[in-house]
Amino acid sequence: MADITDIKTILYTEKTLNLQEGGMVVIQTSPKMTKTSLKAVLKEYFGFTPLKINSLRIDGKVKRFRGRLGVRDNFKKFYVKLPEGVSLENVGA
């Protein structure tokens, strides 16, 4: 089972800030995290059960590092619908 260390960050972009007004938050995690494990982590560490979770797997880009090809890390993004009255402000900032 995944734990809190698999959550990398909460994303703060222009798009995610617009989603936060509607009660959504976007969380970047390691690729091995699943919806059920994220739900368990949010319940255990933050004390709430999300209403809905959508996931998106993103492959790392191929980039050049000092003339050689390298690959950035793969990760998952989760779009989490928060219950009324719950916010994750100042977490991961």
From Swiss-Prot:
InterPro entries from the UniProt entry: Nucleotide-bd_a/b_plait_sf, Ribosomal_uL23-like, Ribosomal_uL23/eL15/eS24_sf
Q: Which UniProt keywords apply?
A: Ribonucleoprotein, Ribosomal protein, RNA-binding, rRNA-binding
Recorded hits in SUPFAM superfamilies, A to Z, give: Ribosomal proteins S24e, L23 and L15e (SSF54189)
GO molecular function annotation: rRNA binding; structural constituent of ribosome
Q: Which GO terms describe its biological process?
A: translation
Q: What are the GO cellular component annotations? A: ribonucleoprotein complex; ribosome
Tell me the domain of life.
Answer: Bacteria
Per the record, the coiled-coil ranges are none
Give TM regions.
none
Record flagged with keyword Ribosomal protein:
yes
- What is an example of a Pfam family matching this protein? Ribosomal_L23
Q: Does the keyword Ribonucleoprotein apply?
A: yes
| Stated family | Belongs to the universal ribosomal protein uL23 family.
Outline what the protein does. One of the early assembly proteins it binds 23S rRNA. One of the proteins that surrounds the polypeptide exit tunnel on the outside of the ribosome. Forms the main docking site for trigger factor binding to the ribosome.
**Stored NCBIfam families:** PRK05738.2-2 (NF004362)
Subunit relationships: Part of the 50S ribosomal subunit. Contacts protein L29, and trigger factor when it is bound to the ribosome.
**Per its record, how is this protein called by name?**
Large ribosomal subunit protein uL23
Q: Which organism is it from?
A: Campylobacter hominis (strain ATCC BAA-381 / DSM 21671 / CCUG 45161 / LMG 19568 / NCTC 13146 / CH001A)
